[in-house]
């Protein structure tokens, strides 16, 4: 569960290392975002010569959370940290590589590119 002011790791090679959630998109007073939800983030830590710079406001999709996601068979998939993938205005990933596993819940029409780039799909 990601809320405003939550810090997330970036799971792609866009140049950002850490981002902070500034808004959960998808409703006027929506408080929490889970895996597969789109959030507005600001870049807090970035590497030199990256595609994004510190202070930029971007859109991102949540790919891993400590809270996890519950499957229909009752199992819960949790991760050690919260991570997101940065998106451009067309909701496509900015980076060309994805680091770490992603869940099967991202396998929708919008995020198939992220699933295909990921090294492991749980």
From Swiss-Prot:
Whether Signal counts among this entry's keywords is no
Which Gene Ontology terms describe the biological processes this protein takes part in?
A: translation
Q: Which Pfam families match?
A: Ribosomal_L14
Gene Ontology terms, cellular component aspect? Answer: cytosolic large ribosomal subunit
Statement: the UniProt record of this protein carries the keyword Ribonucleoprotein: yes
What InterPro entries does this protein's entry cite?
Ribosomal_uL14 (IPR000218), Ribosomal_uL14_bac-type (IPR005745), Ribosomal_uL14_CS (IPR019972), Ribosomal_uL14_sf (IPR036853)
Which molecular function terms from Gene Ontology are attached?
large ribosomal subunit rRNA binding; structural constituent of ribosome
Q: Which SUPFAM superfamilies match?
A: Ribosomal protein L14
Q: Which UniProt keywords apply?
A: Ribonucleoprotein, Ribosomal protein, RNA-binding, rRNA-binding
What NCBIfam families has UniProt attached to this entry? rplN_bact
Identify the HAMAP family for this entry: Ribosomal_uL14
Subunit structure of this chain's protein: Part of the 50S ribosomal subunit. Forms a cluster with proteins L3 and L19. In the 70S ribosome, L14 and L19 interact and together make contacts with the 16S rRNA in bridges B5 and B8.
According to its UniProt entry, the function of this protein is described as: Binds to 23S rRNA. Forms part of two intersubunit bridges in the 70S ribosome.
User: Matching PANTHER family, A to Z?
Assistant: 50S/60S RIBOSOMAL PROTEIN L14/L23, LARGE RIBOSOMAL SUBUNIT PROTEIN UL14M
The entry's family comment says: Belongs to the universal ribosomal protein uL14 family.
- Protein's name in the database: Large ribosomal subunit protein uL14
From the UniProt record, report the name of the gene that encodes this protein: rplN
